[in-house]
């Protein structure tokens, strides 16, 4: 019965997202909340300048409302769901402020790095101290085994790293039409299956609400995109997926299921280190999706390829997390 409820959860979030988007997009246009495109980005992206951004609010509202209602309906509104809603709200708020400054104050970089980091730290610290001992414990497990390692206070550092790093990694992936929407749906779908296997149904409900919300948004975000989610959506999704992995004790498995996000982040790190130490670039442009664009791939080809890689990694993650 609950499995059907999870499908209903995804369906409700999808319908809310699809219903809200056509209403919200004209509103964003009216407010002139258009995306500004950086000059150093691919030249083909300049035509996207002015496309409404901050569409992540639709994802945000759809998944928050649906997960809250369905968790209450199925009596699974526990500490886990509350923590997930807290992280989603907090990181979504940071993203909203970042987007607002970009489009209203006309400051292309939004919040400063320090401002953003402080906000991310505060939410991560709150998550740890509220959830420690109640929703999660301070050990990690080796995926596919019963082996666990108690980290004590080192786990605090891991939580900070995962939430801050996860939110920024997912944010880096949001550079092509539909890329993040699709990869996020795949990753959260994989974690929902693992959550069901662990009988953590509150987490599963939340994950399926995210799946439905981002797929509904994808209808309007696929190439050519009518709207971008902005940092409002990407930071919220990044913080949420890291929190899900922590609550399911699948911290290490996140590297596999979120492999696309990891590859995007590593490409940026490698590019920066290489350029600063040798003066040469490893990639034509980073993050990685831009490299393939400059290699002559169409935007749609890059997106579908990354979706496919994300799907294969998700299947591998499910196999390790559920059946090994």
UniProtKB/Swiss-Prot annotation:
- Cellular component GO terms held in the UniProt record: plasma membrane
Bilayer-crossing regions: 5-25, 52-72, 77-97, 122-142, 149-169, 176-196, 201-221, 227-247, 253-273, 302-322
Keyword Cell membrane among UniProt keywords = yes
Looking up PROSITE patterns in the UniProt record yields: MRAY_2 (PS01348)
Described by its record, this protein's role is as follows:
Catalyzes the initial step of the lipid cycle reactions in the biosynthesis of the cell wall peptidoglycan: transfers peptidoglycan precursor phospho-MurNAc-pentapeptide from UDP-MurNAc-pentapeptide onto the lipid carrier undecaprenyl phosphate, yielding undecaprenyl-pyrophosphoryl-MurNAc-pentapeptide, known as lipid I.
Membrane-topology descriptor: Multi-pass membrane protein
Q: What is its EC number?
A: 2.7.8.13
- Which Pfam families does the record associate with it? Glycos_transf_4 (PF00953), MraY_sig1 (PF10555)
Which BP terms from GO are recorded? cell division; cell wall organization; peptidoglycan biosynthetic process; regulation of cell shape
Any one GO MF term held by the record is: UDP-N-acetylmuramoyl-L-alanyl-D-glutamyl-meso-2,6-diaminopimelyl-D-alanyl-D-alanine:undecaprenyl-phosphate transferase activity
User: Which keywords does UniProt give here?
Assistant: Cell cycle, Cell division, Cell membrane, Cell shape, Cell wall biogenesis/degradation, Magnesium, Membrane, Metal-binding, Peptidoglycan synthesis, Transferase, Transmembrane, Transmembrane helix
**Required cofactor(s):** Mg(2+)
Protein family (similarity comment): Belongs to the glycosyltransferase 4 family. MraY subfamily.
Task: Spell out the subcellular localization from the entry.
Answer: Cell membrane
Which NCBIfam families would you find in this protein's record? mraY
Superkingdom of source: Bacteria
Q: Is Magnesium among this UniProt entry's keywords?
A: yes
Q: In which pathway does it act?
A: Cell wall biogenesis; peptidoglycan biosynthesis
Which reactions appear under catalytic activity for this entry? UDP-N-acetyl-alpha-D-muramoyl-L-alanyl-gamma-D-glutamyl-meso-2,6-diaminopimeloyl-D-alanyl-D-alanine + di-trans,octa-cis-undecaprenyl phosphate = di-trans,octa-cis-undecaprenyl diphospho-N-acetyl-alpha-D-muramoyl-L-alanyl-D-glutamyl-meso-2,6-diaminopimeloyl-D-alanyl-D-alanine + UMP
Name of the protein in question = Phospho-N-acetylmuramoyl-pentapeptide-transferase
State the disulfide connectivity.
none
């Amino acid at each position: 019965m609950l499995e059907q409820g999870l499908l209903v959860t995804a369906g409700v979030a999808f319908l809310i997202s699809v219903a809200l988007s056509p209403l919200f997009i004209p509103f964003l246009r009216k407010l002139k909340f258009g995306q500004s495109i950086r000059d150093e980005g691919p030249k083909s992206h300049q035509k996207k300048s002015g496309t409404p951004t901050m569409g992540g609010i639709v994802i945000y509202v759809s998944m928050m409302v649906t997960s809250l209602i369905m968790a209450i309906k199925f009596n699974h509104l526990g500490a886990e769901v509350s923590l997930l809603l807290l992280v989603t709200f907090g990181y979504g708020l940071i993203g909203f402020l970042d987007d607002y400054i970009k489009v209203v104050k006309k400051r292309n970089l939004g919040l400063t790095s320090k401002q953003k980091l402080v906000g991310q730290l505060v939410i991560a610290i709150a998550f740890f101290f509220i959830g420690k001992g109640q929703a999660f414990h301070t050990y990690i497990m080796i995926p596919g085994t019963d082996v666990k390692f108690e980290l004590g206070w080192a786990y605090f550092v891991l939580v900070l790293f995962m939430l801050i790093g996860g939110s920024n990694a997912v944010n880096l992936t949001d550079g092509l039409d539909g890329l993040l929407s699709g990869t996020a749906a795949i990753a959260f779908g994989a974690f929902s299956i693992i959550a069901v296997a662990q009988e953590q149904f509150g987490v599963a409900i939340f994950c399926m609400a995210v799946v439905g919300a981002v797929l509904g948004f994808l209808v309007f975000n696929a190439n050519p995109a009518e709207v971008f989610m902005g940092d409002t959506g990407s930071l919220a999704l990044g913080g949420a997926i890291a929190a899900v992995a922590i609550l399911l004790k699948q911290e290490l498995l996140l590297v596999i299921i979120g492999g696309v996000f990891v590859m995007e982040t590593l490409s940026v790190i490698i590019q920066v280190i290489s350029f600063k130490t040798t003066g040469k670039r490893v990639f034509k442009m980073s993050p990685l999706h831009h490299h393939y664009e400059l290699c002559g791939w169409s935007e749609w080809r890059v997106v579908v390829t990354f979706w496919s890689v994300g799907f294969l990694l998700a299947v591998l993650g499910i196999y390790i997390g559920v059946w090994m």
